């Protein structure tokens, strides 16, 4: 595609982007969920005298906030790409969707994976320079050549490993990609067949949660089922969108009461460590009752800084674990003391870690996440348009903040 034709196409592309109003409450809720995951992983730094797991299950059950991400994702994808429209999408439009999704998650995943690999290479060289065994690059079953290739292909949570590998949080991106491919398949089939596919997905979700209940296991207990776990929560999000009219007639006061009751119930269910399916159901209810950006909870969520945390949530999520690992290694190398050596010291360390994660995430969002997303979107879409020149048709790709 020559430059003139490319810029002509780009102008049309921007004009015909499907405009969807951002669900600001959902953006803010993503930020809350990301911070909860950070606290879940940082709680291991606390001194035993202030171990939160001694008096509450709230952080122990924090893995459920990842399921919350999947529910939000399913709802937003159904909303942005108009899943209830019976007409099937063309393969070309579906490819545009996949390009947008890959551009959304893969660049930061690749950058953080490379950073993780470089860190372990650096540690190996330092150990070698000190006359110690050069370890830590391909050190165990969590970090080997096979898992590295799987991470590069973003398929490492598709049932081939027993646990997380390399940059641990990236497992959810792999599971998310699995959901994106399922959603792409839904877009390419028409209304009746799409309904049948959704019924099949719903049955799969029911079977997964019934298996968890029957075996008295947590949803994260069998890592090889991570893709099914993600698809189950993602399907809940789609179904919530299809049933969203259930709250449209509620007054703002009624909606506020439901929002407050759902939040209190969710807090209590996490605190007492009840069955995961109940907490997931309450999370789903919160997603549903906030999608219209009405009610007191939405007013609280729609503040500048809380919304900003939502925008930075992906970078927060992707960098916090590597920062945690590096900081722990450096602290213990320089001081010779474990992080948990004192209650006050451990609290200050956790506060410092959170204070470090946020600015790094802001920088990452502005200088890595957004630029690479735009670059890949333009380049891959340009290649697609060069191969399949359009007689203009609507391309359903959300604007930057809605993705």
Feature-to-residue mapping (PLM):
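Acidic/polar hotspots within intrinsically disordered regions
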Residues: 2-3
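Alpha-helical transmembrane segments in multi-pass integral membrane proteins
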Residues: 9-25, 35, 39-62, 77-94, ...
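Conserved beta-strand->loop/alpha-helix structural units within folded catalytic cores of enzymes
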Residues: 28-34, 73, 105-110, 174-188, ...
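Short, conserved phosphate/pyrophosphate- and ester-handling motifs at nucleotide-, phospho-/glycolipid
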Residues: 30, 67, 176, 309, ...
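His/acidic/aromatic-lined binding-pocket segments of jelly-roll/cupin-type domains
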Residues: 67-69, 232
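Active-site helix-to-loop segments that bind/position phosphate- or nucleotide-bearing substrates
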Residues: 102
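Hydrophobic alpha-helical transmembrane segments of multipass membrane transporters and ion channels
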Residues: 107-111, 115, 178, 315-319
């Amino acid at each position: 595609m020559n430059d003139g034709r490319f810029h002509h196409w780009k102008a049309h592309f921007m004009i015909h982007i499907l405009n969807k109003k951002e669900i600001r409450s959902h953006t803010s809720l993503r930020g809350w969920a990301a911070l909860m995951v950070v606290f879940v992983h940082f709680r291991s730094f606390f001194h035993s005298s202030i171990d939160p797991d001694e008096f509450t299950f709230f952080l122990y059950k924090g893995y459920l906030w990842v399921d919350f991400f999947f529910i939000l994702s399913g709802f937003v994808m159904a909303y942005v790409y108009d899943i209830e429209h019976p007409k099937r999408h063309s393969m070309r439009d579906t490819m545009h969707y996949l390009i947008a999704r890959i551009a959304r998650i893969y660049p930061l995943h690749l950058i953080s994976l490379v950073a993780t690999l470089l860190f372990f290479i650096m540690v190996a060289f330092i150990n070698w320079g000190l006359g110690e065994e050069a370890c830590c690059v391909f050190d165990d079953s969590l970090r080997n050549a096979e898992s590295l290739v799987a991470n590069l292909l973003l398929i490492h949570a598709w049932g081939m490993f027993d646990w997380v590998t390399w940059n641990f949080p990236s497992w959810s991106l792999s599971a998310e990609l699995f959901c994106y491919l399922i959603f792409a398949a839904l877009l390419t089939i028409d209304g009746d067949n799409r309904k049948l596919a959704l019924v099949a997905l719903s049955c799969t979700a029911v079977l997964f949660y019934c298996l968890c209940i029957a075996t008295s296991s947590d949803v994260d207990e069998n890592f090889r089922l991570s893709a099914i776990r993600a698809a189950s929560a993602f399907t809940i999000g789609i179904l919530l969108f299809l049933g969203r009219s259930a709250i449209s007639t509620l007054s703002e006061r009624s909606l506020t009461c439901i929002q407050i009751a759902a939040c209190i119930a969710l807090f209590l269910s996490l605190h007492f460590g009840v069955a995961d399916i109940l907490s997931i159901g309450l999370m789903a209810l919160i997603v549903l009752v906030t999608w219209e950006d009405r009610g007191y909870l939405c007013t609280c969520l729609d503040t500048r800084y809380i919304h900003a945390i939502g925008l930075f949530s992906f970078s927060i999520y992707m960098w916090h674990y590597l920062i945690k690992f590096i900081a722990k290694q450096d602290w213990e190398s320089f001081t010779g003391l474990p992080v948990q050596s004192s209650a006050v010291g451990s609290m200050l360390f956790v506060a410092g870690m959170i204070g470090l994660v946020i600015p790094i995430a802001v920088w990452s969002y502005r200088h890595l996440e957004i630029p690479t997303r735009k670059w890949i979107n333009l380049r891959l879409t340009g290649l697609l348009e060069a191969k399949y020149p359009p007689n203009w048709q609507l391309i359903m790709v959300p604007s930057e903040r809605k993705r």
